[in-house]
Every structure is written in structure tokens, then in C-alpha cells.
Amino acid sequence: MTTDTDTDVDAGTDLEPQPEGPPEKMLTRRTELTPMLSQYLDCCEAHPDALVLFQVGDFYEAFCEAATTVAQVCEVTLTQREDSTGTYRMAGVPIDNATSYIEALLSADFRVAIAEQVEEAEATSGLVDRAVTNIITPGTVTNGDLLTDAAATYLGAVSITDSDGDASEMTGAIATVDVSTGACRVTSVEHDQIYEELSRLRPAELLIGPEVDTKTIESSSLPFETMQTTHNSGAFELATATQTLEAYVDEPTAFLSSAERRAVGAVLDYAEYTQGDCGPLEYVSRIRRYKTDTALRVDATAIQSLELFDSRQPYGETLIETIDETSSALGRRTLESWLRRPLADHEAIKTRYDAVAALAENPLVVETLTEKLSHIYDLERLTARTAREQADARDMRSLLQSLDSIPEIKSALIEVLTETELPAETLEQLQAELDSLDDIRTLIDTAVCSDPPQTVTDGDVIAKGFNDDLDDIREREEAGREWVSELETRERERTGIDSLEVGYTEVHGYYIEVTNPNLDHVPDEYTRRQTLKNAERFYTPALKRREDEIIAASNRADKLEYELFCDIRAEVAAETSRLQAVADAIGRLDALVSFATIAISHAYVRPEITADTLAIEAGRHPVVEQTQAEFVPNGITFEKGHIAMITGPNMSGKSTYMRQIAHICILAQAGSFVPADAAQIPVLDRIFTRIGASDDISGGESTFMREMSEMTDILHNATESSLILLDEVGRGTSTTDGRAIARATVEFIHNEIGARTLFTTHYHDLTTVTGSLPSAFNLHFKVHRKTHPDNDASVTFLHRVTSGAADSSYGVEVAKLAGVPTPVVEQAQRYIHTEGEDYTEISEQGTHHHDELTHAEMVSVDHDNQQNQASDDDEIARSPRGADTNTDAGINQSDVSANIDVLKSLRDIDIARMTPLEALNMLENLQRRLDE
């Protein structure tokens, strides 16, 4: 919004410092400011950590430094406001379209305080009162337009108990609240688990207790985006936090530790602050305390490398996207929470399997449930908006539509329970929890119009017949409008003016319009109201009385409708706990139906939970099998403490195979069926991964220090109940050092930890450790190598796991398949021949150690191969051949054996993990060293 004294100015390119807080220029002229700017300054001082958007008419305005920020971030015009006290920069955004601008400010890491006009301009002759009604931050978003998807948005808080300075002995607590739904949770964690738990929860905003060293929780080091907030330190004080909690739960000291009380108290205090200091958030009706050791723990590294929720590729699929067949936002959030915290209790897992199995037995009912669940709106967020007094009439109708689906959902569940012979404790419980909420349904259905306007103050919100007084007022209003509509006919007949018209404008009200040629026929009782170019507008005493009656009735009706709607909304809000219970049940049912749907459509099988054995028969990668036309299943069988040494070329599928096993274990413990012909899964306590980029050369590669840091975490924290996936440990350093580190790692895991481990390596002599480690065995990926008449060779990856160690890494052949120029490939082959046969050979002990596999292991691997039995020629016919090579590049071939260091450097190169540019740079470096 601009005034006659506003002028455009250049916003510049750099953000000015401190756009939040009171502008220095206004502080120095406080006594001279206009009343409106004084209001703005007061809002800025009250919220120094936020950028204030100040309502002026139909715009939100910002001034001084904040104006520059708004202009640059939101790409709007920066102007100047001049008054008697000076010149102030200003920038504004239209209120009707403010959401996109607020989203841009949030993305730029600003908190936004909304200062609204809290009284109508017509209601006062002086300055309109304004107040900050909402502070929007990344972790406290409640606006439906800013909540872009069904995912939970968490505000988190971290507190740590007092200690004697020994960080290893410190314990802390992490609390989260989803302000949009009211879900609040807290857990205690060891000091070294804080990072891991935060990575699992992924709060959008994080409050740090004053006793926490922020260096230990730097947002830049977390594997997700979060805003780190320093809130009022007093909110973390135990007494203050306990007092805050007492408004939510009875006797918080009875079930929450001091660290937990401090974390929950602080997070709720901040949530209240951002909602306009409205007091306790009534819809936060329950605080759930959980333990981290009651779930399968998947740390941040594993979450990333397994691509559970985020893909490393720009358009890659994730595990949750692949298995998500939910129909509602409630189900999607539940499904994600189950994947983030898979079960670690045998009976709980089995109970969830029973529910999925009972549903999967009846595909038609599953289809019915899917269709009915699709009519369920986001009940949690609707309930929260209702409790915050932000729900409008359309929200009420959405709530009604959701509740109307519940009886049919209950009927479908009863059909499943009637027909199944399986234990169905979970489904029985859900059926009982699905309260039809008939009282709320009846209230909304009889009270709120079926197609109400967006704004509840616009009228036509309350249904006819709900309130007698409102109906009487509406009848008087309607009678007045009918009288006016009949007036035109009567006056035409009475005056003889056929062109006479009766109309209405917001400014002048009702009028009788007569064209200029007929003005001589205007009756004396007509009073002129407005003169137009070709006509005059009049009113009569009777018309004016009717107009006053209609306006008065309309205003009374609108006021009464708003009062009635607020009463209805409050009555619904009083049932928040019942609505939340139904929402929770719907979410769990939707997630179970999703599991059943994926099991039916993709032939997933029910796993068997075992004590020790991990056996997968013809397992499939759940993501890859849906993105590739042909997928070769592979299985594995190994007991607690067994280590599978996996060899084979790059691109053969080793990393995919390891991720496949991890995905199957995670799905199994989440309660889902799994992609395999059969599966026996033990209850794991943790999954660790040290996996580099995915099986193409477009992925990034971790530094050696990162690799060793991750290995340190694994070796310190893994137990015999863990699953460890290690991909080419030691590749980031010299061959000698890398081989030594890899071997020592395998021996330590075997002798000291005893965890089930999958270990891929290109150090072929490392496969000989199976001779000295009784629980280690070799697996490799089969490759078909064909020599052509011109002595050229090609390889085809069969993607099939079999026992024993690979006879070569086929690095040069992989480079050729990847399209590396022919001169580079040929020269690499010469270097290999120069080094001798020992470059590719491995010891007989490593090659033939598969004789030492247990019978079960050999049966598992061989059975999977038989399941996919086809001749190598058939496999080759279906597999892509290498790309045509580029023969334009030249290369210096002189003195190839003159410098043994150059040859060793070439041998250590992992070509398949190099980009074309890196390969050419390395080749240039080798040439230069030879020339020297």
C-alpha cells in the first residue's frame, strides 16, 4: 500500500542487518512518531526475534530494515514513506495473497509476526487497534496453505541434565510438538544419542536449552534443514516448565523426568507464544512418552544411504513413496512414523502381521476401505483448527464429510472380522475405537449450510430451521426484498414509465431510476438520490423504510449467525479428545490397509519372526523392482554373528543387494509384508550402514575421514542383534592401508561384536579371511565374460548372487561399458598385463571357500538361482551391451613400464566411481609423470 508521499527506491542486492526487532531509526525518534508508526514500533519491540508484517488496510507493511528484506525476499517494490518525522522505507504485500510471500520469508529463515487490525475501521474514529495475533515460524506453521503436504511439522526442544562436566555421563531429553495437530511426544536420550534421535524426528525448528553446548548440535551438521531458535531461557527452568505442563497434564512429575519436563515445558511455552500468547493449547490433550530402545534404531547415516525418505537422485524414488498406498493424510503420517520407528517387540510385530493378513485375505473389502478412507479429510488438523477457533464453516462441512464415512468403514471392518479365521486383535480394537460421533455429525448437519461461504461473517452459514430467532429475522429480510422486487412492476403501472427500474448499490442503497426523457412523469413523492448522464435516481419514503428494515435485518442476521457459528464451533471443540482418538484410529487403519494393498498388488509375503536366523528367499528390492522392467531376485541365509563377504564388479548390484536386505528387515519390523518368496527375520535392535554412492557414477563419494567416523560409530555401538552393511571399507586411502583397515574391521566385528554383517570389497585377497573366521563366508555376483574373435572381451552382469568369491573386479570391462574412450580402456589393459597375472588372481583358498558354507546357506543361494534359472545366453540376450566407444582421443604409449609408481597409481584407480572429467584429468596427470 502506498500514499501520495510514497516513492520507489532501489532495494539493493544485499540484505541489511537485523531486519527483526525495532528499527533503530524509529527508536531514536520515538516521541515524534505518528500513532500508527508507534504501534509498529511497539510490535517490533515486543517480538525482537521476528520480522513484523503490519496490517494497513488490505496490505501487510514492513518498514526500515524489514522493508528492504521484504522487498528483496518477496520481490516486491521498495518505497519510501515521508511524514513530519522523516522518511522511512516501506514495502508491502497484499493480504489476500500473503501466503506465498510468508512462505518465501520462512524459506529465507525469518520468523514472521503478523500484526493485524483487531477492530473494524468503521468502529472507531481514531487509530485502529492492532496486535500481533500469530508468529509464523518453520516449526509452528498452522495455516493450511503453508502446510503443503500431509507430513508432520515438528517443533523440537533439547534439554540436558546437570552433570559434573563429563559429556559421556550426561543424559538429556527431546520433546516435539506438531502445532498443526497437537501431537506431543518426549523421550530421554543419552548425550551421544541426541544427534541420532533428532535426525530421525527431523524437527523444522529446534529450541536449545541454555545448558546445551550449541556446538554439539549445530544445525549445519544435521542431515536436514532446521531453524535453531534461542527461546526465553526461563521457559527451560524446571519450576517454570513444570508449571506450564500442569495446564496440560495432571501431576507431570509422576511420569516425566526433570529433563523431560524442561524440554516439554519449553516447547509448549514457545508454541503458546507463537499462537499469540493465547494460553494453553487445548488441543494438545495428551503428551506421549516413549523410549528409544523399544524400536529398531536406524541412524541418520542409514536413513540417508537407504533412501528411506529422501532420494539422493533428483527424481529418485524412496522407500516410503514406493510402499505408500494410504488414502488420507492421517494414514500417510502414521505410515511414516512406523517406518521411522519400526517395532522391536516380537508380539507387537506379529499382531500387526495378523491385521495385515486378515485384510489381505479380502481384496474387495480392501478396495472398499481404500475408497471410503479417501473421503476422510485431515481430521487432526481440522480438530486443531477448531480448537484454535480458526475453523470456518467449510471446515465444519469437511469434518462432517469425514465423520459420515465412519459407519461404512466400521461395516467393512466387521466384514473382515467375520470372514477371517486369523487373530485380529488390532482390527477389533480399531473397530471399537471408531466412534461414529453421531452427536457431532447431527449438530453440524443441522446447523451449517451445505455450501457455506469461506468467510463466516458473510452470512448464509447457518442452516434454515436451526434457530427460530434467526429464521424470523431472515423472513423479515426476505419479505422486505420481495416487496422491493415487486416495486418496479407497481411503479411502472402507476407512473406509466415503462423504462423505470429499481436497483441497489453499496454506496447509495435502493433507488428508482428514470431516464431523462421521462422525468416529467416523475411523481412528487420521489426524492432525487443521484444524477447520471442519461437518467436520475430517486427514492421514496416507503422505499427508504424498507431499505432500513432490510439492512437492519441483514446485520442482525449476520451477527446472530456468527454468534451461533462460534457456539457450534465451541461445542465441536469440546469433543477434541474424541475427535483425536478417531483420527488416530483412522491413521492406523489407513496404514494397515496400505500394507495390505501393497502386499496384494506386489506379491509381498508374511515374514516369520525368528530368534536368530535371517533367511530371505528370492528377495526383491522394493523400490528397484518397480522401476525396472526385469529384476533378478536374490536371497540370503545367515545366522547371528555371520559375515557375508561379497565380491563382484561395480555396477553388478552389490549395493542394491545390501539395501534390499535392509529394506526387507525394516519393512518386516514395521509390520509390513515383504518382497520375497519367503522370509525369516530376527528382531534387530539397530541397522548400521557404511554405503557410498548408489550403483551409478553420478553419485557423490564420502571422504576417508567421513568413512572412518562412521565406522567408529558402528564399531562402538553395534551389538550382536544389529545388522551391519559395509560397502568397500578402506577405499578412500591407499591400497595397503585400505586393505589392512578392511581386514581388521572384519575381524573385529567377527570376534568382538558378533553382528550379522554384509561386507562388500574389491580387495580380493580379503576373501581369504573366511579361512580363519568360522562365521564368515563368501558370496559373489555372477558375470558372463565373452571373448570375441578380435580378442576383445565384453562382460554382461547377471545380477545373480552365488556362493564363493569373484575371480575379478572386471574394472576395465565396467569402464568400457560405461563409455570410457577406447584408448583409455586399452592402455589400462596394458598396465594390468605389465603388472602380471597377480593383479587379477586371488588365492585358491578365497576362491573355493564356499565349500565351507553351511548347507542352509548353499541351499538358500542355490535355490534363489534356480528360481530365476535361465541360460547365460538368455540372460545376455536380454542385457544391454556396452556403448560404442570413442576412438578420437590419442594417448602417449611410450615407456609404459618405465615408472612403476605410475603403474601402481593406475592400479589403485576405481574407474567406475570416476566422472569422465576426473578420468581425463587423471590420465593427463599420468602422462605428465611418464614424460618427466
UniProtKB/Swiss-Prot annotation:
SUPFAM superfamilies linked to this entry: DNA repair protein MutS, domain I, DNA repair protein MutS, domain II, DNA repair protein MutS, domain III, P-loop containing nucleoside triphosphate hydrolases
Transmembrane segments: none
A GO molecular-function descriptor: ATP-dependent DNA damage sensor activity
Classification via InterPro entries: DNA_mismatch_repair_MutS, DNA_mismatch_repair_MutS-lik_N, DNA_mismatch_repair_MutS/MSH, DNA_mismatch_repair_MutS_C, DNA_mismatch_repair_MutS_clamp, DNA_mismatch_repair_MutS_core, DNA_mismatch_repair_MutS_N, DNA_mismatch_repair_MutS_sf
SMART domains (alphabetical): MUTSac, MUTSd
Keyword field: ATP-binding, DNA damage, DNA repair, DNA-binding, Nucleotide-binding
Positions contributing to ATP binding: G648, P649, N650, M651, S652, G653, K654, S655
Stretches with biased composition (Acidic residues): 1-13
Chain spans, region Disordered: 1-26, 865-892
GO biological process, one term: mismatch repair
Family, as annotated: Belongs to the DNA mismatch repair MutS family.
HAMAP family xrefs: MutS
Known function: This protein is involved in the repair of mismatches in DNA. It is possible that it carries out the mismatch recognition step. This protein has a weak ATPase activity.
Name of this chain's protein: DNA mismatch repair protein MutS
Organism: Haloquadratum walsbyi (strain DSM 16790 / HBSQ001)
Gene of this entry: mutS
